[in-house]
Amino acid sequence: MIRAVLLGLRAVVFDREAARRLYASGYYGKPLGIPKPRGSNFDAPLELGLLETLHLLERGMLEVYDEEGHRVSVEEVRRRAERFIPKFELLYKVYRDLRDRGYVVRSGLKYGSDFAVYERGPGLEHAPYLVHVMRVDEEIDPLEIVRAGRLSHSVRKAFILALTGPRDTPIRYLLLKWSKP
């Protein structure tokens, strides 16, 4: 079992061999000090965000401990994520769904979206999709759609709205594309 230590809003896998295995198993996390890793041949600890940590913990791929060496439960990680990540429930629901469908999900912050989504993985391709997560009943300003569409078009990525709600609300994915009249 791979062991991680929860440090604030991140979990770190210090065992470098375990870090390489975990990264190779689905491009989870970021090797510390390596901005753009090419594959899993790196020699560094692996930093995981709370969404990744919770996902791996729920799937039995990771054990999480605090700094004193006490085991951290799924519920504790979830509570921490709910406290510090705005719209956590919606984001995690979409993150988990995309991962379960076989996609590699990374932060889309540098593109102004919630997620950048890969079919194969970073370093193998550019992310073909940007995903913005919203509540299904949330209003959106049409100008925001135009902005997001223009940005995604300028970086050659498809823009997807992921619309969902609390627990049992299904996720609806809307792919927005530019069309020429």
Swiss-Prot record:
UniProtKB keywords: Lyase, tRNA processing
Catalytic reaction equation(s): pretRNA = a 3'-half-tRNA molecule with a 5'-OH end + a 5'-half-tRNA molecule with a 2',3'-cyclic phosphate end + an intron with a 2',3'-cyclic phosphate and a 5'-hydroxyl terminus
Active site: 118, 126, 157
HAMAP family given in the database record: EndA_short
Pfam family, one: tRNA_int_endo_N
Protein name stated in the entry: tRNA-splicing endonuclease
Organism of origin: Hyperthermus butylicus (strain DSM 5456 / JCM 9403 / PLM1-5)
The keyword Repeat is assigned to this record: no
CDD domains: tRNA-intron_lyase_C (cd22363)
E.C. numbers: 4.6.1.16
Main enzyme class: lyase
Main function: Endonuclease that removes tRNA introns. Cleaves pre-tRNA at the 5'- and 3'-splice sites to release the intron. The products are an intron and two tRNA half-molecules bearing 2',3' cyclic phosphate and 5'-OH termini. Recognizes a pseudosymmetric substrate in which 2 bulged loops of 3 bases are separated by a stem of 4 bp.
Subunit structure: Homotetramer; although the tetramer contains four active sites, only two participate in the cleavage. Therefore, it should be considered as a dimer of dimers.
GO biological process, one term: tRNA-type intron splice site recognition and cleavage
Xref: SUPFAM superfamilies: tRNA-intron endonuclease catalytic domain-like, tRNA-intron endonuclease N-terminal domain-like
GO MF, one annotated term: lyase activity
Record-stated family: Belongs to the tRNA-intron endonuclease family. Archaeal short subfamily.
